[in-house]
Amino acid sequence: MNQDKYVFAQLTAFMNRTQFNNYVRKYDGNRYVKHFTCWNQLLAMMFGQLSNRESLRDLIVAFEAHRAKQYHLGVGREPIAKTTLASANQNRDCRIFEDFAFYMMKEACEKRATNILDIPGKKYAFDSTTISLCLSTFPWAKFRRKKGGVKAHVLYDIEAQVPAFYTVSTASKHDSTAMSSILYEPNAYYIFDRAYDSFKELYRIHLTGSFYVVRAKTNLKYKTVKWKRRMPKNVLTDAEVKLTGYRSEKKYPESFRLVRFYDEEEEREFTFLTNAKQLTALEVAELYKKRWLVELFFKWLKQHLKIKKFWGTSENAVRIQIAVAIITYCLVAIVHYDMKLKRSTYEVLQILSISLTDKTHLRDLFDKTKFNDVKELDYPLFPGFKY
């Protein structure tokens, strides 16, 4: 069935086009469109991501070189002008692509669900990455007086090892403000760094029946209500505490748990706050250690997909490009899982980047390609994921 299909077309066949079209209709994305549809736009942007195009002009040159293959790649019959793609990114509702990104994240999370920790319930890490922008080119993204930037806030499923939710803001907004956009699930665990010490939001997590683990700031004001006397190795404190600061006490009126842990590998001490009384102190520390997976995700995203350089200057264009990067990431994760590939996903992407216009079956491509010299640079795409 895939004998005469290009590799890129085989890859994008894993996506649910019907679902994407539902979002297009919802936001009237193809209104007044004659040739270059929203689906064509998505595939064109994904082709640019997977083939490592540096700019919009670079992407258009690539399509000009493959003019005869355009229709079968899924980007339409008509030649794509730079102004056509730029206008689509500028004017078409970014929510079409963001909603589809959420759909792809949900599908990837459900398919790749595993249990890397012996703790019942979903486990998420929430963090952000800042992408610097030129203020004169992106005036809407003002960060500091002479600097611009955007933040991508990501809720990362640490067991499926794909994002479960994300939101985009200007870099000037404090990290903790993004916590209000999360729909917390009962009995799930949410891991935060100390930038997310909003006691109002932490109390909302508690009232939802969810659990949090957050690293405490050094200026935390509290009183000890009860503490454990016998503790395992490297656990310095395991106590029930209550906030004493006037404002913080009003935001979080109940007691919670404070755990101080000494990490021998890093030779440093960590203090965690949590409402998960059912966990041991060592499980709390182990849960927080998994937060590094979201940092690896950000590093991988910036290194292998195009979000450091944007192909449009409007907020809408930036949001579309970030959404397409997330969609591409999830697609590769789904293909990697569905095909039970034994290669690292870095190898998969390297093979794809030079094979998108070949007519080799995906299975043959990944089984037969000699890629023994390719090493993962610093980390796998899905570190520790077992297939």
What are these regions (language model features)?
Residues E64-Y71, V75, A178-M179:
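Glycine-rich loop/turn
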Residues H72-R92:
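Major-groove recognition helix of helix-turn-helix-like DNA-binding domains
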Residues K69, R95-I96, E107:
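Short helix C-cap/helix-to-loop transition motifs enriched in small/turn-promoting residues
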Residues L73, R112-A113, A141-F143, E201:
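Catalytic micro-motifs at enzyme active sites that drive phosphoryl/nucleotidyl and oxygen chemistry
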Residues K106-A113, D175-S176:
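A short, well-structured juxtamembrane/interface segment
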Residues M1-D58, A62, R92, D99-Y103, ...:
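Single, function-defining residue in the core of a domain
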Residues N52-S55, R67-H72, S87, L133-C134:
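Short active-site-adjacent helix-start/loop capping segments
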